[in-house]
Amino acid sequence: MKLTCVLIVALLFLTACQLTTADDSRDKQEDPLVRSHRKMQKSEDPKMAERCSNFGSDCIPATHDCCSGECFGFEDMGLCT
């Protein structure tokens, strides 16, 4: 009887921990491709660092090559904002 009560309490405790953890991590996960791209742009290692275009420079929206990460334009050509 005591063992059953201990198991039930442990199960309830673990369930509560899972629910609390799930609520805290909501909307914090970033798309892995965007996260790795930002890591490469901010890297101090010259081999890993990627050159990015400054504000007002030409860019290609599909490549996300602006330092700000935002390229305003059409498929082939745009400007970094």
Curated annotation (Swiss-Prot):
Annotated localization: Secreted
Listed InterPro entries: Conotoxin (IPR004214)
Keywords, ordered alphabetically: Disulfide bond, Knottin, Neurotoxin, Secreted, Signal, Toxin
Top-rank lineage group of the source organism: Eukaryota
Propeptide: 23-51
Intrachain disulfide bonds: C52-C67, C59-C71, C66-C80
UniProt keyword annotation of Membrane present: no
Stretch list, region Disordered: 23-45
Tissue expression from the record: Expressed by the venom duct.
GO CC annotation terms, alphabetical: extracellular region
Secretion signal, residue range per the UniProt entry: 1-22
Main location (coarse class): secreted
UniProt feature, compositional bias: Basic and acidic residues: 23-34
GO molecular function, one term: ion channel inhibitor activity
Claim: Secreted is one of the keywords in the record: yes
Family in the record: Belongs to the conotoxin O1 superfamily.
Domain comment in the entry: The presence of a 'disulfide through disulfide knot' structurally defines this protein as a knottin.
Protein name: Conotoxin ArMKLT2-0311
